[in-house]
Amino acid sequence: MAAELEYESVLCVKPDVSVYRIPPRASNRGYRASDWKLDQPDWTGRLRITSKGKTAYIKLEDKVSGELFAQAPVEQYPGIAVETVTDSSRYFVIRIQDGTGRSAFIGIGFTDRGDAFDFNVSLQDHFKWVKQESEISKESQEMDARPKLDLGFKEGQTIKLSIGNITNKEGGASKPRTARGGGLSLLPPPPGGKVTIPPPSSSVAISNHVTPPPIPKSNHGGSDADILLDLDSPAPVTTPAPTPVSASNDLWGDFSTASSSVPNQAPQPSNWVQF
């Protein structure tokens, strides 16, 4: 079921690759590209590297139609499925297989050295990813095999927490914090704080009355209009002489002396006739 869910992804595509028939390896020293007929390739076409699951596939296809010429499954790299030659970095030996299980070794080569580098790196990156996935899967299995740690409370189990400024078990409230630094405190008033005013001097008398000036008489002759004007003018009001105020009733003393020393100012005569 897991194999059916796996999808095929393309790792590398190179449009130009040459295929060579190689002679059998005479010793264990490795393959040499100089032993091949490099100027007469047996087949040319396109190379495509795909992956499905953990296995990579090197596919040799026709450039125009895309028909599959040969395929080399790779399950490990470096390994027997893909080998490098000893005398060049642009040529490799791959093991191709058909559907019946038969296999053969052929040589492939790239004209551009950069294409050979991409071919090599694509296989390395794929199997590096396969290795990381295997390690992650192994670690997860080990974690599942370990006994799980039970951190829950058992039945009847209690714990005690100590938190500041909270009423304790005996019911006593926590002590209030005292203010430290920076605060201003108001002092209470002194006991018996009554303001006493000293009595004023008995020799000072206050006169709050100002005598109005006499009304000047008219300089005109004794005409009838003057007589009428004199009749219309108000009669002078006689005011009694000011009586001195006793020193016991004076509460401000020296302030009254300043008010009594102000000279009386006579009002200016008015030219308006009062009716």
UniProtKB/Swiss-Prot annotation:
Chief localisation class: membrane
Location of Phosphothreonine modifications: T211
Biased composition (Polar residues): 256-275
UniProtKB keywords: Cell membrane, Cytoplasmic vesicle, Endocytosis, Membrane, Methylation, Phosphoprotein, Protein transport, Repeat, Transport
GO biological process, one term: protein transport
Pfam families noted in UniProt: DUF1681
Motif interval(s): WXXF motif 2: 272-275
Modified residues (Omega-N-methylarginine): R180
Region annotated Disordered, chain positions: 166-191, 211-275
Sequence motif WXXF motif 1, residues: 252-255
Compartments, record wording: Cytoplasmic vesicle, Clathrin-coated vesicle membrane; Cell membrane
Gene Ontology CC: one annotated term: clathrin vesicle coat
Coiled-coil region(s): none
CDD domains according to UniProt: PHear_NECAP
Subunit details: Interacts with AP1G1 and AP2A1 components of the adapter protein complexes AP-1 and AP-2. Interacts with the GAE domain proteins GGA1, GGA2 and GGA3.
Its biological purpose: Involved in endocytosis.
Domain statement: The WXXF motifs mediate binding of accessory proteins to the ear-domain of AP-1, GGAs and AP-2 through hydrophobic interactions. Selective binding to the GAE domains of AP-1 or to the alpha-ear domain of AP-2 is tuned by the acidic context surrounding the motif and the properties of the second residue of the motif itself. The WXXF motif 1, which is preceded by an acidic residue and has a glycine in second position mediates specific interaction with AP-1. The WXXF motif 2, which is followed by the C-terminal carboxyl group negative charge, allows specific interaction with AP-2.
Family (UniProt): Belongs to the NECAP family.
The protein's name: Adaptin ear-binding coat-associated protein 1
Organism: Pongo abelii (Sumatran orangutan)
High-level lineage: Eukaryota, Metazoa, Chordata, Craniata, Vertebrata
